[in-house]
Structures are given as C-alpha cells and as structure tokens.
Amino acid sequence: MASGTTTTAVKIGIIGGTGLDDPEILEGRTEKYVDTPFGKPSDALILGKIKNVDCVLLARHGRQHTIMPSKVNYQANIWALKEEGCTHVIVTTACGSLREEIQPGDIVIIDQFIDRTTMRPQSFYDGSHSCARGVCHIPMAEPFCPKTREVLIETAKKLGLRCHSKGTMVTIEGPRFSSRAESFMFRTWGADVINMTTVPEVVLAKEAGICYASIAMATDYDCWKEHEEAVSVDRVLKTLKENANKAKSLLLTTIPQIGSTEWSETLHNLKNMAQFSVLLPRH
C-alpha cells in the first residue's frame, strides 16, 4: 500500500447503519443541514476530522432510527456527500450471515451484491432532474472500490479482528426479514450475507464517481440454520451493542491510512467511468 505525501486531498463520507452511527468518532464536530435536487438526506451532515482527515458522517436511518430501509433517500444521501466534496464513502451495515463460517460478530468486507429490492430509485439519471441529464448505464462488475477494500482488510488483520476479505451481499427490500425458504434460496445463489441497504447505495456511489466500500457486521444467522434462533430485532441490537467497537476501531484506524495513500489515479478512473457511462440526448 503506497503511503507518503498525498497529492490528491481526500474527504471521507461515513454512512452509519443501525447502531453504527456514533458521531463521537469525529473531532471538532459541526452540523450542517443541506438540501439536494433529490430532497433532503436522512439527517444533518456531521462534519469533523479523524486524525486530521476531513470526514462527513451521516446516519442512514436518521439519528433516531426513524427511517425504514425502503424510505431512505439514498439519492439525496450520496448526492449530499458528493457535493460536500467526499472522495470516498465508507459505510457500516448490520447483516445476517448465510454461511456457517461467518459468525455473529464477524466483519465482512463485501465485494459483490445481489439485488432483491423492488421499490427504490437506483440512478440519479431518472429523467426528472436537470442536474443529471441523460441515461446512465454504469458498469457494476466491480461494485466496491478494490483499493479501499484492501486498506480495510489490511487494517482489520493488524487489529486482530475476525474479518472475511470478501463476500456477496444480497439486499432485500424489507422491512421484514426473510422467510426460511428465501434464506435457503439465497444460500443456493451464492450469497454470503443479507441486509436491506447496500442497494441502491453502492450503485449511486458508482454513478457519483466515489470510492465506496462497506464494513458489514454479521449479527445473526438469518433463519436458515437448524437449532439456531431465527433473526429478530432484539438479537440484532444485542450483537451490535456487543461488537460495535470493532467497526469503530476499524474506521478510526483505516481512515488515517486512506488519508496517507495516493488516490489520484483511482479517482480519475472512477470519474471517467461515471462520465462515459452517460448517454446524453441527441440535438
């Protein structure tokens, strides 16, 4: 991993999921309420620093957790972070494990997704906003930023965390949990973990030309595992409370590493990909 003097300034957006959105991780915090062409984001942006790296924290479900997954304004959230100058977005998300080896309390640095959502806008280029003209066909073969993932994986190893270096996330619409038949089906599809928020967040970040990576915290075994209690809200919150410090320490240690790494080529490539994926109207 290259380090040294950075020629490209970075700013890290942090989207905190259920139980993983503690603003105390930021030094010198200030709040900023913003609006976007797509409406208001989930909550105020919390601006601050982590070891001299500029960061912007946003609670995905609102600070009081009042927004269900289907109603999160993913477009506004990503747009607001982009407008604030974020080059990277690192998110935390609770998830269910679909694999024996991914135990509750483990971290997964996911590298792929399967989309089972049905109600969510997945593009800024929806034809109704002058700020995003045209139609965007963004490539998603590699949805998550490999370089950011590598920094997260290396840091997790140094911290001695139980961390899985890859995994496929299936995102369901929610807010209900899966039936047992669905849970079995997702396992046969090759999914490793399950949540309700990765899509469309990762897609919109790619359209915005942002380096996006996700820290997924396994809280349960969903409902496929025999002789194991099925997922419930109480169980998810209990596991998060016991293990949230792992995600916190990973963020606090990773972000200075990102701040000392050269990103100009990565960001240039992402910007070009986003730009050249848009088909503009013919005149």
Curated annotation (Swiss-Prot):
pH dependence: Optimum pH is 7.2-7.6.
Pfam families named among the record's database cross-references: PNP_UDP_1 (PF01048)
Reaction catalysis annotation: S-methyl-5'-thioadenosine + phosphate = 5-(methylsulfanyl)-alpha-D-ribose 1-phosphate + adenine
Pathway the protein takes part in: Amino-acid biosynthesis; L-methionine biosynthesis via salvage pathway; S-methyl-5-thio-alpha-D-ribose 1-phosphate from S-methyl-5'-thioadenosine (phosphorylase route): step 1/1
EC supergroup of this enzyme: transferase
Protein family membership: Belongs to the PNP/MTAP phosphorylase family. MTAP subfamily.
Subunit structure: Homotrimer.
Protein name: S-methyl-5'-thioadenosine phosphorylase
Originating species: Homo sapiens
Lineage of producing organism: Eukaryota, Metazoa, Chordata, Craniata, Vertebrata
